[in-house]
Amino acid sequence: WYSSMFAANIKQEPISHHLHHHHAHHSHHRHDSNSNSNASSPHQSPLPSPNPPSNTNLQLEQYLKQQQQQQQLQQQQQQPMDTLCAAAMTPSPSNNDQNSLGWLSGLPNPMQTIMPANMRPSPTATTATAAAAAPTTTVAAIALQANDKLQALTPPMDVTPPKSPAKSQQSCAEPEKEHDLMSNSSEDMKYMA
């Protein structure tokens, strides 16, 4: 279920444009390297390239899902605030994975350096808060803004959720409630501030 939500997230976000656009570049280069044998291929490749990205989207999603599941285990310990912020970056794993696959090498590098902490929990966010991902995205942006104000509140809240996300694999509802609570508190803080 979260895969479709995740796909929807990617499609909602401008990242999908990057994904298609840059993959078009990538396949163009790929065809360029083949241009020795297929001279016409580079010229045609931008046209068929929209099809490969759709496949690539699926592959990427599967790849991302694996990443999520692996990193979920590692990143459950991450602070929920990071997870919330990462939910805003939900599409960015696609950038990250694209980079690890050798595409977009220039683009995600600054992103990775800017948000290395967020990039990693972000798969956690997509799995744990996928249902809340769409609302959380805005809330996460709010959380980012309110993060400084929430700093005082954040540590105690951080202490409990790392345990509850660990449960997220068994019962996704709990972390969602956690994150919804976090989201609401973030929103309230924003409005109160």
Swiss-Prot record:
Compositionally biased tracts (Basic and acidic residues): 174-193
GO cellular component term of the entry, any: nucleus
Low complexity compositional bias, start-end: 34-44
Region (Disordered): 18-57, 153-193
Localization: Nucleus
Ranges annotated as biased composition (Basic residues): 18-31
Single GO biological process annotation from the record: segmentation
Gene Ontology MF annotations: DNA binding; zinc ion binding
Keyword terms of this UniProt record: Developmental protein, DNA-binding, Gap protein, Metal-binding, Nucleus, Repeat, Zinc, Zinc-finger
Main location: nucleus
Free-text function comment from the UniProt entry: Gap class segmentation protein that controls development of head structures.
Sequence similarity: Belongs to the hunchback C2H2-type zinc-finger protein family.
Name of the protein described by the UniProt record: Protein hunchback
Species in which this protein is naturally found: Drosophila petalopeza (Fruit fly)
